[in-house]
Each structure stands twice: as C-alpha cells, then as structure tokens.
Design a protein with these regions (language model features):
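Long, contiguous, secondary-structure-rich segments that constitute the structural scaffold
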Residues: 1-35, 106-122, 126-231
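Long, low-complexity segments enriched in small/aliphatic residues
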Residues: 10-110
C-alpha cells in the first residue's frame, strides 16, 4: 500500500497504535514504567487514569437495563463418538512457544529449542503403559480422516481415554485428523473433538528418519535449507 513503516523503536509503534485506538490512548510508556503496567481501557494520558482493573464496576453493564444478560443454549452432543475402532478422544490445543501454524515463528532457532517437529500427543500414563510407549517415542495418531506421526507425552493432566495435541506443526499436522462437521448456526467446525487411536511404532529408527527427512524437505521447499541438511 506504500505506507511508510520506519520506526526507531517499539515505543514509536505503540504511540501510533495509541493514536488509532481510544482505549489505548492513556497507556503511555511513561505511565507503564511508573505503574509497572496498565490495563486497558485507559483513555487519558494523565496519571489520574490508571487504567481499568475490571469492567462493569459497580455492577452496571453496557446493556439497556444495565444488567448482565447470561445467554445459554441447549447441549448438542459431538458428531463423532469414540468406538472400538477409534477408542480415544482427540482435542487440539495451542503450543506456548509458537504461534498458530508457525508461519511467523517456525524458523526461529530459539523457539525451535523449546519445541520442534513433529510435536507431541499428550496421553494419560495409563494409556501409555497399555500401549507400551514412553515419553519421546514416535507414535502414529489416526482418525477417520487421516494419520500423522508425533511424539508421545505422558501426563496426568490428560484423563485416561483422552488425548490432546498442539496444532502448530507441519509434520504433526493434527488438523488433518479433526472433524469438519459444522455447527448449524455459527458454521464453526468441530475441531476440538473427534475419535482417534494411537498406534505404537516398533521401528523407532525408521520413524525418526522419516520425520527428519520430511522436515528437511519442507524446509527446502520453503527456501530455508537444502534437502538432507542437518535440521
């Protein structure tokens, strides 16, 4: 669009944002430094406006009658239940160290040291024991729509019979497994629940070689590294 984008520091960026959004206007760098942080909305640059700790103070809401209106809807069961063929539930979650599909963070070496391909599938230790897999083992996760290879992560934070997987990965692309059934009104896909099964991979060396080869090829196609390079 030809808009000039030269900034000398992050404060200049923030100052421009403050001018464009009234709710941020009062949150100057000076005020943030003095108070240790400012919660928006903060409308006035003076120190009298210290931001808003919480909305609707005094119990008054931005509605016609000033009361908070709680809306609800009838429960609708998931479109795909677990069964003998796919006995575990599958949910996608966010990876702390990366953003969305890693378009902006996937090539940062520091973030790759936190977590990297092909991601993890979190499982209850009881399920891991029954399957005969340990932390870091490569496993195959399969649903009615596809399959992928990822690493096993035993954790008590997941209930027996359940799994979850972060959706940031290119090889461990968990949205290949998710259900595309739509909510009838919002048309939101049912990405957060489907049936799956986890399979043990007996030849870990072969699976590891596959992951590294695929990762190198992906990075080569992106113009990052030559295929076969150390990733």
């Amino acid at each position: 669009m030809g808009y000039p984008m030269h900034y000398n520091n992050t404060q200049e960026i923030w100052d421009e944002m403050r001018k464009l959004s009234p709710k941020f206007t009062g949150a100057t760098y000076e005020k943030i430094d003095a108070l240790g942080g400012v919660q928006w909305p903060c409308y006035d640059e003076s120190m009298d406006d210290k931001g808003t700790m919480f909305l609707h103070e005094g119990g008054h809401f931005a509605t016609e009658d000033g009361r908070g209106n709680l809306l609800f809807t009838d429960y609708e069961p998931v479109k795909e239940e677990v069964d003998e063929e796919y006995p575990m539930s599958f949910c996608t979650v966010r990876e702390v160290g990366h953003y969305s599909a890693r378009t902006m963070t996937g090539n940062c070496r520091m973030l790759a040291k936190l977590e990297d391909e092909p991601g993890w599938v979190a499982m209850n230790p009881k399920d891991c024991e029954e399957l005969g897999v340990a932390q870091g083992d490569l496993v195959r996760v399969r649903s009615r729509r596809g399959s992928l290879i990822t690493r096993c992560l035993p954790t008590e934070r997941v209930k027996p019979g359940s799994t979850n997987m972060t959706y940031q990965w290119w090889i461990g692309a968990c949205n290949e497994l998710t259900n595309t059934a739509l909510d009838p009104k919002s048309k939101t896909p049912e990405y957060k629940y489907c049936a799956c099964r986890v399979e043990k991979l007996d030849d870990q060396a072969e699976a590891e070689a596959y992951v590294q080869t695929q990762y190198a090829l992906i990075r080569s196609k992106m113009g990052i590294e030559k295929a076969g390079a150390n990733v």
